[in-house]
């Protein structure tokens, strides 16, 4: 795992055990779930224990608990940056604990761990594979319209109007429907929806987003096998000098073909803690970020410069919502207004629990932003809930 254990002292191990106990205690006080809104109370929203955690930063909570070990804090800060795009000084204590308590908890070295805890199933395309599978039946039925940018969404007395620019034809098209699922990031939805509802405008002002730089490096042959940790799917560089550096993923690590060959390394930088990061992304070209990624990888892999044949950088100005203090409490109240109208939510003919979907009379909003942080499970479940509401 990523938790530093080699050469650490007993004081560090003791803090690992104390943090493990604290995560377990937090889970007993109020359950953590993924998707997170499965744990919301239908009438009051976020549990009082979670509201208290949501009111402070994770760093402040750790200080409160007397957890100040440098190795533990490095690991926890990495986990926050990896999932939330910003470190423990910026995300809430709720978010820091949710990372562990909603999954398998935190296990200190020597503690019993379930056999399946470390099992990881991935695809070379990452979440791209999941989106391709979700899109395939829509494409087969002619229901997927790509190469189109939505310019305006407006509720009318009879339904919903959507104005969209077709990049293939160069024309603006108007689509009409009885209802619409708006699966856009909140900051985009607030600009696209005409006369946005108050909760959407408030969320756009309240939420904060982390910029990311993602660098894909094509290698014509495997990197040299060097002493140290064995190659893995997710590889973290301890002491990465790049701001926000998270290490890299090897796209071919879980290929069934055991023969070594060309591969792609994806290096990530989460820039939520970097001042003016969005401006830096906009003004510094792709070459700057590509060179930074190669320099970081050249430390553990000196032969990367000889193996690299192509470098592609993608800059995300608003990659994901950061769960800063107060966000969970705020978002938990939005879905409590209930489903507009009197329609029942049905799935396969069975009535479903009404999930807290932000909605107006004709628009249902579905995006991981409404959960305050970005993972596939949140996005998928919110889309599913919005689809049931619209159904």
Identify the meaning behind each predicted range.
Residues 1-32, 48:
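Dinucleotide-binding Rossmann-like beta1-alpha1 core, especially the glycine-rich loop
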Residues 1-12, 137-144, 151-161:
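Feature captures the FAD/FMN-dependent oxidoreductase FAD-binding
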Residues 6, 159, 165, 218-219, ...:
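Conserved flavin/dinucleotide-binding core of flavoenzymes
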Residues 24, 28, 35-149, 159:
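Active-site/ligand-binding neighborhood in enzyme catalytic cores
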Residues 43-51, 116-124, 200-208, 274-287, ...:
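Active-site rim elements
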Residues 46-50, 57-71, 80, 174, ...:
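Rossmann-like dinucleotide-binding core of oxidoreductases
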Residues 55, 59-61, 65-67, 72, ...:
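Conserved beta-strand->loop/alpha-helix structural units within folded catalytic cores of enzymes
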Residues 148-232:
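Central helical "cap/lid" subdomain
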């Amino acid at each position: 795992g990523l938790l530093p254990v080699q050469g650490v002292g007993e004081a560090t191990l003791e803090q690992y055990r104390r943090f493990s106990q604290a995560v377990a205690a937090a889970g007993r006080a109020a359950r953590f779930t993924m998707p997170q809104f499965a744990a919301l109370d239908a009438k009051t929203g976020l549990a009082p224990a979670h509201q208290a955690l949501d009111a402070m930063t994770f760093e402040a909570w750790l200080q409160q608990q007397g957890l100040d070990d440098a190795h533990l804090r490095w690991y926890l800060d990495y986990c926050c940056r990896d999932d939330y795009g910003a470190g423990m000084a910026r995300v809430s204590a709720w978010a820091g604990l949710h990372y562990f308590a909603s999954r398998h908890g935190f296990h200190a070295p020597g503690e019993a761990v379930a056999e399946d805890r470390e099992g990881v199933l991935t695809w070379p395309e990452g979440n791209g594979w999941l989106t391709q599978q979700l899109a395939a039946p829509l494409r087969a039925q002619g229901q997927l319209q790509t190469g189109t940018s939505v310019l305006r969404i407006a509720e009318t007395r009879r339904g919903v109007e959507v104005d969209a620019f077709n990049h293939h034809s160069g024309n603006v098209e108007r689509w009409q429907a009885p209802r619409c699922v708006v699966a856009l990031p909140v900051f985009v939805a607030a600009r696209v929806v005409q006369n946005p509802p108050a909760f959407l405008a408030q969320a756009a002002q309240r939420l904060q987003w982390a910029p990311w730089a993602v660098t894909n490096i094509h290698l014509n042959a495997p990197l040299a096998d060097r002493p140290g940790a064995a190659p893995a799917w997710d590889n973290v560089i301890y002491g990465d000098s790049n701001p926000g550096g998270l290490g890299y993923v090897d796209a071919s690590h879980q290929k069934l073909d055991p023969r070594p060959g060309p591969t792609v390394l994806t290096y990530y930088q989460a820039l939520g803690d970097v001042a003016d990061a969005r401006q830096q992304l906009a003004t510094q070209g792709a070459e700057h970020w590509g060179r930074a990624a190669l320099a970081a990888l050249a430390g553990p892999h000196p032969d990367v410069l000889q193996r690299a044949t192509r470098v592609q950088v993608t800059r995300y100005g608003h990659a994901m919502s950061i769960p800063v203090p107060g966000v969970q409490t705020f978002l938990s109240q939005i879905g409590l207004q209930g489903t507009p109208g009197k329609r029942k939510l049905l799935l396969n003919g069975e009535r479903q629990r009404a999930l807290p979907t932000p909605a107006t009379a004709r628009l249902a909003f579905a995006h991981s932003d409404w959960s305050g942080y970005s993972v596939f499970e949140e996005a998928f479940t919110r889309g599913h809930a919005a689809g049931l509401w619209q159904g």
